């Protein structure tokens, strides 16, 4: 346990000099007692570089206000570690595993695991492919999620990534009753606060651990909070054999924080100003999220797409690790279609007959080809109008519009804003309903009846309310 002294403070980066034989290892946690008006505050640093001359460069996990040159720094001799196990359920933590929910503190005797760990070996990995039903039609039909897989929700600012994540937490907790870990990485504190109270009201919080490093926190906390959440999830997988859900909102902020830290550490930036270690950092996080022979971690990650540019290195690097992608499209939000999932751009490794069954696969591909044909005809419609289309094309367009509207639905978590009841639609019902639309069974029902509903029964009810004979 070495003692060092602060030699330099550059925002969230602090240099510390130790005695010759006491230089701490990379990733070790160091502590500084920072004097405050109401007593001393313990600031945690993480060693990032060994500069030579017995100096290490560290990243602060909290504000460095009040830190001065010459202050004493203690080496803890180990990584940052967080509490794990059932004590974490129903609680809210920061990056260091300290509770921030105004409830009683967690006992020091509770088991704590380090946040830096090796990914599971090849011989431990499970290769079974099983579908995770979400109750969201567009997801279950066209880009189904895999149990123990990695799922990305891609979209620009304000297209509904967080709302979709909240609905998934709600549906999976209510229908499947599994344990969830939510890591809020560099997002709005208000959203985290709302999510906590919503989950408390619905009772879901009892099976959820929450870890936050939000927008207002230093880059060190935002860069490490995803690892803190993952460590809690790994315990439930490895020690208790559970199938755990890990929600990360937002994985782009993990990369963004890494970029800020990289620049402060003096590394040469790579493409678009990102850190040169972007692929390595992402790989170290993503490879730990996997299914093993003991249990599984299914991760659902919101991915902010800067300026809606999917070729940006941050979303492009994330793409490489995912099994399913759900792409949110701004044009659909403008049309009032929620969730604004692009049915043609969203993909899933699980959409094949051997996994979902032949009927589901055929319906999904037919829905996509109908929507693709409609997209191709849109230019002709814009220039010449519907009258110039052949009867077959007119029928395709009308069915495609019904499909497009029927892919929308009301969410439970949005009830307070919309005043409409949310709906959970089982996969079997979804496949059967879309088969009927494709077969022309509901061509006589006006397309407005298909907007923001659950199953076909809701469409028929809505059509009756509109005065249509069904």
From Swiss-Prot:
It catalyses: ATP + H2O + 4 H(+)(in) = ADP + phosphate + 5 H(+)(out). Gene3D superfamilies: 2.40.10.170, Bovine Mitochondrial F1-atpase, Atp Synthase Beta Chain, Chain D, domain 3 (1.10.1140.10), P-loop containing nucleotide triphosphate hydrolases (3.40.50.300). It is an enzyme of class 7 (translocase). This is ATP synthase subunit beta. GO terms for molecular function: ATP binding; ATP hydrolysis activity; proton-transporting ATP synthase activity, rotational mechanism. SMART domains: AAA. Belongs to the ATPase alpha/beta chains family. SUPFAM superfamilies: C-terminal domain of alpha and beta subunits of F1 ATP synthase, N-terminal domain of alpha and beta subunits of F1 ATP synthase, P-loop containing nucleoside triphosphate hydrolases. ATP binds at residues 155-162. One of its GO terms (cellular component) is proton-transporting ATP synthase complex. Its EC number is 7.1.2.2. It is found in: Cell membrane. F-type ATPases have 2 components, CF(1) - the catalytic core - and CF(0) - the membrane proton channel. CF(1) has five subunits: alpha(3), beta(3), gamma(1), delta(1), epsilon(1). CF(0) has three main subunits: a(1), b(2) and c(9-12). The alpha and beta chains form an alternating ring which encloses part of the gamma chain. CF(1) is attached to CF(0) by a central stalk formed by the gamma and epsilon chains, while a peripheral stalk is formed by the delta and b chains. Its main location: membrane. InterPro entries: AAA+_ATPase, ATP-synt_VA_C, ATP_synth_F1_bsu, ATPase_a/bsu_AS, ATPase_alpha/beta_chains, ATPase_F1/V1/A1_a/bsu_N, ATPase_F1/V1/A1_a/bsu_N_sf, ATPase_F1/V1/A1_a/bsu_nucl-bd. Produces ATP from ADP in the presence of a proton gradient across the membrane. The catalytic sites are hosted primarily by the beta subunits.
């Amino acid at each position: 346990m070495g003692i060092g002294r602060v030699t330099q403070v550059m925002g969230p980066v602090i240099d510390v000099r130790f005695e010759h034989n006491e230089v701490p290892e990379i990733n070790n946690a160091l502590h500084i007692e920072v004097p405050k008006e109401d007593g001393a505050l313990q600031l945690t640093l993480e060693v990032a570089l060994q500069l030579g001359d017995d100096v290490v460069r560290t990243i602060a996990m909290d504000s460095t206000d009040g830190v001065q040159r010459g202050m004493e720094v203690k080496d803890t001799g180990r990584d940052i570690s967080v509490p794990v196990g059932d004590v974490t359920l129903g609680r809210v933590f920061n990056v260091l595993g300290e509770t921030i929910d105004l409830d009683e503190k967690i006992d020091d005797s509770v088991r704590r695991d380090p946040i830096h760990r090796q990914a599971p070996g090849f011989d431990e990995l499970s290769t079974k492919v099983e579908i995770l039903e979400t109750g969201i039609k567009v997801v279950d039909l066209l880009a189904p999620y895999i149990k123990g897989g990695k799922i990305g929700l891609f979209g620009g600012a304000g297209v509904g990534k967080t709302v979709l994540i909240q609905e998934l937490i709600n549906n999976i907790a209510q229908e499947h009753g599994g344990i969830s870990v939510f890591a809020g990485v560099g997002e709005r504190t208000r959203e985290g606060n709302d999510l906590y109270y919503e989950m408390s009201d619905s009772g879901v919080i009892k099976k959820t651990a929450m870890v936050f490093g939000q927008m207002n926190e230093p880059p060190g906390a935002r860069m490490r909070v995803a690892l803190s959440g993952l460590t809690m999830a790994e315990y439930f997988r490895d020690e208790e054999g559970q199938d755990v859900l890990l929600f990360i909102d937002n994985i782009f902020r993990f990369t963004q924080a890494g970029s800020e830290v990289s620049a402060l550490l003096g590394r040469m930036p790579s493409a678009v100003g990102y850190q040169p270690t972007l692929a390595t950092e992402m790989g170290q996080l993503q490879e730990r999220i996997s299914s093993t022979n003991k249990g599984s971690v299914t991760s659902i990650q919101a991915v902010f797409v800067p300026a809606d540019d999917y070729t940006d290195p941050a979303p492009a690097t994330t793409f490489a690790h995912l099994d399913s992608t759900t792409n949110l499209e701004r044009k659909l939000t403008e049309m009032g279609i929620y969730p604004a999932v692009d049915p043609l751009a969203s993909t899933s490794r699980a959409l094949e007959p051997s996994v979902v069954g032949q009927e589901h696969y055929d319906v999904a591909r037919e829905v996509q080809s109908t929507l693709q044909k409609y997209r191709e005809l849109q230019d002709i419609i814009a220039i010449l109008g519907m009258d110039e289309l052949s009867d077959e094309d007119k029928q395709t367009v009308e069915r495609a519009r019904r499909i497009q509207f029927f892919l929308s639905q009301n969410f439970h978590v949005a009830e307070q804003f919309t005043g409409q009841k949310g709906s959970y639609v089982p996969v079997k019902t979804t496949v059967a309903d879309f088969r009927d639309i494709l077969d022309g069974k509901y061509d006589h029902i006006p397309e407005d009846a298909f907007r923001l509903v659950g199953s076909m029964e809701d469409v028929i009810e809505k059509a009756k309310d509109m005065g249509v004979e069904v």
